[in-house]
Amino acid sequence: MQLFTMMTWLILSLTTGCAVSQGFNQAAMSDVLHVDPTSDQDTRTPSHEGSIPSPPFRLGVFFANHDFPNHQSLRKVEWLSADREQLLHGLAPLRDQQILADIFVLMDSTVQAANSDAIRQAGARYGADAVLIVDGAGAIDRYNNRYAWLYPTLVGTYLAPGTESDALVMATGSLWAVRSEWHAPIQIVEGVSKAVGSAVFVDDSAALQSAKKQAIQALSTRIVDQLQLWMQESPPPRSRLQ
């Protein structure tokens, strides 16, 4: 009787806890990242205050961490070693093209994510000419689909693909010179992923990790394309020395 009661509560929670898609609260994600998602990054130009480092230069990549409580509409993005390696690999074409001399991860636990000046100072201590500040936030939309009607059966609870977990990761990249006030427009990208299965086995964290991987790929591609463009549009070295 006790087992039957436990199974009844399990089935009820599975069928009623996430019945309808709620979508993503992108406004909350943008607030955490301090960005305006409606801005058109392609039409914005880098700051003319100071000069962009002369190529090839050393780039330090700083992965920011935020402390906020996880809930359905907002998830903290954890930057793993694999994530850092993926981004560095994605930026490798800039080294092949002699725009960058070196790319490395800037690790400094004393620096706060929102303090760009402190991050630039840390970059200078480690020999960087510019720093790329990477930030991110995630969200999960978990809901039932048409197969959820099978959940009241014991077999259906474990086998019916009645639950979907949509994941969104919004990532930003902000490029700053270390020894001048030059900085580029913040780049905003998104990665999405979906997991489908029984409510017992659908893993929200796996969907979020997959979306993060997509976001990192999009961000590295965006930075490569934009930095190539910014270098072409920057004044020649003779003008920068005047």
What kind of feature is each model-predicted range?
Residues T38-G50:
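A short, compositionally biased domain-edge/stem linker segment
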Residues T16-P37:
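Bacterial Sec signal peptide processing site at the extreme N-terminus
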